[in-house]
UniProtKB/Swiss-Prot annotation:
Catalytic activity: O-phospho-L-seryl-[protein] + H2O = L-seryl-[protein] + phosphate; O-phospho-L-threonyl-[protein] + H2O = L-threonyl-[protein] + phosphate
Organism taxonomic ancestry: Eukaryota, Viridiplantae, Streptophyta, Embryophyta, Tracheophyta
Protein name: Probable protein phosphatase 2C 62
UniProt-listed Gene3D superfamilies: PPM-type phosphatase domain
CC per GO annotation: chloroplast
Organism the protein comes from: Arabidopsis thaliana (Mouse-ear cress)
Keywords assigned by UniProt, alphabetized: Hydrolase, Magnesium, Manganese, Metal-binding, Protein phosphatase
Length: 724
């Protein structure tokens, strides 16, 4: 074979030509071909090819007049050294190659189509499964919901059947058994025991709802004989039906104790019962809904001296409370007066039995006007504490403001001029009638309140005053800061970004920082470090569970957590009660103004002139920080600012602006804006005398005059007090 395979007229199936890119080749026939020509030509013809070797082996050379064979470029490959390898073949071989390539492509397309069809079928199967599962779950829910709906329908039907209009006219009530009936005409003490047993048999449920309907059993009206001033109690049995508790109905009995009003009134009670002194006291509590309440009967003609329970009186208007004395039946107040074992009282959680010791007698004084009640002493008949007076605790349902303004007093001798008693908009006189251990004042006792004479303690009227002063001593004062801020950039440095940063947190924390502008020469944002430093301080204060109060510790932790490059001055202040704690590093500062004068201010910290002390990563804040402690009063003004304020305005100028703004009742935000604007206005001046010009002159820079135009950030805080 020749040096180049292309010279062989009977070439192997593929002709391989190594060559470099754009390298020309000369064939013996004088035709030159380059690499691009090989690539672009679809078919090459070699004619008049003569072997360069003139050897005698003519067997490898074609005949001289043989026709040129057609061949085409099959592929080209670039090697690592930059050379190219071309593969040529005749027409039949190229056709075979193309057919094989087409078959491979068809197989690949069919494979992809099969995969797509399989995926589509899988998705459709999943969708069918999902739809079927949803249908099954919905069917199950409907099946499970059907019984509950049916029970509700049954309950509603039962409820309608129970609430028949004929029930209102009946004089007896059937409870659980037909033989347990209460005759409203002939009820006696023996019937009360059956009522108690029925009440105890009521099922108790934690989920018991409030009574929806309360049906009173009315009896025929009849006149009650006058009982003079003896105490009389009416016990009514109310049937509360149709209460749905845990899916079943239950009937509950509510025992209500009501005081009698006048002796010659027509009363429509359920039953009037004379309480037996020998009746055993049962202290088994029922549900909270079945409380013994003292309320007037709806069918009575109410007089102005109507007695109200404590729970009702708290929901009445001020005018109604002013006209009516209140019987306090709360457990807390009565237990403070008497022993619980000897004098049981009507508690919010009602007891099943009603004994003579549980009745609160109504004194003769309740039938007089408010002025007469105020003038008459309230007599305590208890044997143990005959001279004891009380101060009623604050009502549960009243607000904090009402409880501080109202003074509830029970005393045997109240000194007043009549006007305060008539108004009674601020003071309530709670009338209490107590009973003795032996039951000397009872329903059957003829002893009257007017006949009882007990000594009146002279110091009784002083106890409410002591209690009121004690409540005043509990009122504490909390100090807080009402703050506003203003931050103005330097016109010359506005393009480089904001260099100042600040924060205000929880009405008792403020902070301010001034980034060092020289960092901008190194391509670092001069304000990034200051902003991250203040942001970390605010996070530490907000997230601190132990309520950290030392500003030095806050600044120390913030420096350790700050990752940005740069440096900054910093000032952190914290108000703890009335003491202001400040940690300062650099030429930012603070001042406290009280009554138009400077109470306290900070001193700038410099390495030398125009080179303030600053903090950066790795600094020991505990050693660098300068700490201040200032005791504040209400009305003081705290100012924290960067050097842009203190370099351009003297302290007396700042005080003048603040005091003038206070006279105009301006808010801290507005004052901060005025102070910052004035500082930048002076900073633009070339002639005014400024603190910065004075400092430059002291350092030997006599040529500088006027202000120093710089960024200004100011926080103005008013010290205020809130009562707790």
């Amino acid at each position: 074979m020749a040096d180049h395979l292309i010279l062989s007229l009977q070439a192997p199936p593929f002709l391989i030509f190594p060559c470099s890119l754009h390298r020309s080749w000369r064939f013996p026939g004088g035709i030159r071909y380059s690499v691009p020509e090989f690539r672009l030509s679809s078919q090459l013809q070699l004619a008049n090819s003569i072997s360069p070797s003139k050897s005698s082996a003519s067997s490898s050379s074609p005949p001289e007049n043989s026709a040129p064979e057609k061949f085409d470029l099959v592929s080209s490959t670039q090697l690592k050294d930059g050379s190219h390898v071309f593969r040529f073949g005749d027409a039949s071989e190229i056709e075979k190659y193309l057919e094989a390539e087409e078959k491979a492509r068809c197989v690949e397309v069919e494979t992809q189509n099969a995969k797509i069809a399989e995926e589509a079928s899988e998705v459709s199967r999943k969708q069918k499964k999902l739809v079927s599962s949803i249908i099954e779950t919905s069917t199950e829910k409907e099946e499970t919901a059907a019984p509950s709906d049916l029970s509700n329908v049954i309950k509603i039907k039962d409820r309608k059947r129970v609430r028949s209009p004929t029930k209102k006219k009946k004089e007896t009530v059937n409870v659980s058994r037909s033989e347990d009936k209460i005759d409203a005409k002939s009820a006696s003490v023996s019937n009360l025991s059956s009522i108690v047993s029925v009440a105890e048999a009521i099922p108790i449920s934690s989920t018991e709802e409030e009574a929806v309907v309360e049906k009173e059993i009315t009896a025929k009206s009849y006149n009650v004989e006058p009982l003079s001033s003896e105490a009389m109690k009416k016990v009514s049995v109310n049937k509360i039906g149709d209460c749905e508790t845990n899916g079943y109905q239950e009937n509950r009995m509510e025992v209500q104790a009501r005081p009698s009003l006048s002796t010659q009134q027509e009363i429509t009670p359920v039953s009037t019962i004379e309480i037996d002194d020998n009746l055993d006291v049962t202290e088994k509590p029922i549900e909270a809904e079945e409380n013994l309440v003292a309320e007037p009967t709806a069918t009575d003609d109410l007089s102005p001296d109507e007695l109200l329970s404590t729970s009702e009186a708290t929901h009445r208007s001020v005018d109604e409370i002013a006209q009516k004395p209140v019987i306090d039946t709360s457990e807390e107040n009565l237990l403070n007066t008497f022993e619980a074992e000897e004098n049981p009282v009507v508690e919010p959680t009602a007891t099943a039995a009603v004994s003579s010791d549980e009745l609160i007698s109504t004194s003769e004084a309740t039938r007089h006007s408010v002025d007469e009640i105020a003038q008459k002493p309230i007599i305590d008949t208890s044997e143990k504490n005959p001279m004891e007076t009380f101060v009623e605790p604050e009502a549960v349902h009243s607000s904090v403001d009402e409880s501080t303004e109202k003074l509830v007093v029970v005393t045997s001798d109240v000194e007043n001029d009549g006007e305060n008693v008539a108004s009674t908009t601020e003071d309530e006189i709670t009338v209490r009638d107590t009973i003795t251990d032996s039951g000397s004042i009872s329903n059957n006792d003829d002893t009257k309140v007017e006949d009882l004479q007990l000594p009146v303690p002279e110091t009784a009227s002083l106890e409410p005053i002591k209690a009121a002063s004690g409540r005043e001593e509990l009122v504490s004062k909390a100090f807080y800061l009402d703050s506003g801020f203003a931050s103005l950039q330097s016109p010359f440095k506005a393009l480089a970004g904001r260099e100042d940063a600040y924060f205000i947190s929880h009405h008792n924390w403020i902070g301010i920082a001034d980034g060092v502008s020289q960092w901008s020469f190194e391509g670092i944002n001069k304000g990034m470090y200051a902003q991250e430093l203040m942001s970390n301080c605010e996070k530490i204060i907000s997230n601190e569970t132990a309520k950290i109060s030392d500003p030095v510790q806050v600044l120390h932790r913030s420096v350790n957590e700050t990752k940005s490059s740069g440096s900054s001055t910093a000032l952190i202040a914290h108000l703890d009660n009335n003491e202001l704690h400040i940690a300062n590093i650099g030429d930012s500062g603070f001042m406290v103004i009280r009554d138009g004068t400077v109470l306290q201010n900070s001193s700038p910290m410099f390495h030398h002139f125009c080179f303030p002390l600053h903090i950066t990563q790795g600094c020991d804040v505990l050693k660098l920080a300068e700490v201040y402690h200032v005791n504040l009063e209400e009305g003081d003004v705290v100012i924290a600012a960067t050097d842009g304020l203190f370099d351009n305005l003297y302290e007396k100028e700042i005080v003048s602006i603040v005091c003038g703004s206070l006279k105009q009742s301006l808010e801290p935000q507005k004052i901060a804006e005025l102070v910052a604007a004035k500082a930048q206005e002076v900073g633009r001046s070339k002639t005014e005398r400024t603190p910065f010009a004075d400092a430059a002159k002291e350092e030997g820079y006599n040529g500088h005059k006027g202000g120093k135009l710089d960024a200004v950030t100011v926080i103005i805080s008013f010290v205020k007090i809130v009562s707790t």
